Amino acid sequence: MARRRKYEGLNPFVAAGLIKFSEEGELEKIKLTPRAAVVISLAIIGLLIAINLLLPPL
């Protein structure tokens, strides 16, 4: 529980360690919810896997 209280007021990205504390203000300019960020990252990963399967290395 102590860990949860420690990160209670923080941006979810900062609490997860995805960005540095000094960069927190920069993230606020991008209007993304944490759920949207996860969906976008999963879509990018899926796209890269599909490209790898369709276009084998030369």
UniProtKB/Swiss-Prot annotation:
Location within or outside the cell: Cell membrane
One GO-annotated biological process of the protein: protein transport
Segments passing through the bilayer: 34-53
Extracellular topological intervals: 54-58
Cytoplasmic side: 1-33
InterPro entries to which the protein is assigned, alphabetical: Preprot_translocase_SecG, SecG/Sec61-beta/Sbh
Membrane association type: Single-pass membrane protein
Keyword annotations: Cell membrane, Membrane, Protein transport, Translocation, Transmembrane, Transmembrane helix, Transport
Family annotation (Pfam families): Sec61_beta
Domain of life: Archaea
Any one GO cellular component localisation term in the record: plasma membrane
Oligomeric and partner information: Component of the protein translocase complex. Heterotrimer consisting of alpha (SecY), beta (SecG) and gamma (SecE) subunits. Can form oligomers of the heterotrimer.
Family label: Belongs to the SEC61-beta family.
Record's function text: Involved in protein export. The function of the beta subunit is unknown, but it may be involved in stabilization of the trimeric complex.
This protein's name: Preprotein translocase subunit SecG
Gene that encodes the chain: secG
